[in-house]
Amino acid sequence: MNSTVKYRADIDGLRALAVLLVVLFHFGLGFPGGFVGVDVFFVISGYLIGGHIYQSKLAGHFSWGQFYVRRIKRILPALIAVVIAVWLVMFFISTPADFRKLGRDAAATLLSVSNVTLWNSIDYFSPSAEHNPLLMTWSLGVEEQFYFLAPLLILVLTRFDKKLSFLLMGSVTLLCFAIAAAGTLQIPHSAWFLTPFRAWELFAGALLGMAHTHFPAAFSAKADNLKSAVGVLLIAG
């Protein structure tokens, strides 16, 4: 039970690959499926955050206040800097109408609801979307909303034994996957932006974090390197 989710070079490598794929997709450099990098990010975030919460609660030292303070310190300073930089640049080059729209998007970004605002105003895959300098903050909105939901669910799961907690988390993940699959077919625009349709990826990562807690041998360095190599091949394919 003393296994913790520490720094992982393999995860950093997958994160770097995910960023590269998204960048190549947006620059139109022959990677039409590069947006899968977003999915990789969500699973990694679920694994790191979900695993941390689960382990901290089992060890008896989880603190709601400390959890959110750490999230704020990690995300908000860089996010504010990006928003200010974008605002300053766009002040000189955008039209008054576009600048007003940027103000709305910036406020939504800082309030962790940029995915909802963009869902209501833009088609992610349309050429015009590329002109929105805060377009990519939608995924951060999804992650931040997950930070509000995950602790409550995972803290409930720690009240049950290992087998039942795994079963419940697996059931939640499968239910969210079914919702996402149905949404992708029926309302793909909403399924791209909104957290209920993205939750299964984050919960799948959290499930892996729980597995890491109870089965650390399955996450040895050799096993991790093998799984990372397989992951890279699957993403590249």
What is the predicted function of each stretch?
Residues 1-237:
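Membrane-interface helix/loop caps of multi-pass membrane proteins
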